[in-house]
């Protein structure tokens, strides 16, 4: 299956699995999706992820994180920069999501990172998505 916007597809799969309170979600793998999954892990939005070899690019299996009463760790995900309308932010214009409670994932010349790390590194880039 050909997907026009693979990152939006990844976010939608996570959102749907999260809303249905599934434990795991499988996503076709790519380097960018692996980097996003790593950021989600580091920021505490998911339990863990693993790469499963399927003979092609592989599959990322993400284990979603919930609280003791099935409260979601991820409240919302929003794609910002889309194939039809790219959104860029300079180092001084990097967004703060919900006043710092959420994260923005930025694709910079130094790799994919959170808005907080991009501010620290002093780089701007393409604003991929918001997660809170």
From Swiss-Prot:
Cleaved signal peptide residues: none
Single GO BP term: translation
Gene3D superfamilies the UniProt entry points to: 3.30.1370.30, 3.30.1490.10
Pfam families: Ribosomal_S8
PROSITE patterns named among the record's database cross-references: RIBOSOMAL_S8
GO terms under cellular component: ribonucleoprotein complex; ribosome
Domain of life from the UniProt record: Bacteria
Keywords: Ribonucleoprotein, Ribosomal protein, RNA-binding, rRNA-binding
Record has Hydrolase as a keyword: no
A GO molecular function held by the record: structural constituent of ribosome
Subunit comment: Part of the 30S ribosomal subunit. Contacts proteins S5 and S12.
Record function comment: One of the primary rRNA binding proteins, it binds directly to 16S rRNA central domain where it helps coordinate assembly of the platform of the 30S subunit.
Family: Belongs to the universal ribosomal protein uS8 family.
NCBIfam families named among the record's database cross-references: PRK00136.1
PANTHER family on file: 40S RIBOSOMAL PROTEIN S15A
HAMAP family xrefs: Ribosomal_uS8_B
Stated name of the protein: Small ribosomal subunit protein uS8
């Amino acid at each position: 299956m050909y997907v026009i916007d693979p990152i939006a597809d990844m976010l939608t799969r996570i959102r749907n699995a999260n809303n249905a309170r599934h434990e795991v979600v499988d996503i076709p793998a790519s380097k960018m999706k692996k980097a996003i999954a790593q950021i989600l892990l580091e920021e505490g939005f998911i339990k863990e992820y693993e790469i499963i070899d399927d003979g092609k690019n592989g599959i990322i299996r993400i284990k979603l994180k919930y609280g003791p009463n099935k409260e979601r760790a991820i409240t919302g995900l929003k794609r910002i920069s889309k194939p039809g309308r790219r959104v860029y932010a300079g180092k001084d214009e990097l967004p703060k999501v919900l006043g710092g409670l959420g994260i923005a994932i930025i694709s910079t010349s130094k790799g994919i990172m959170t808005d907080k790390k991009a501010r620290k590194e002093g780089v701007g880039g393409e604003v991929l998505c918001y997660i809170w």
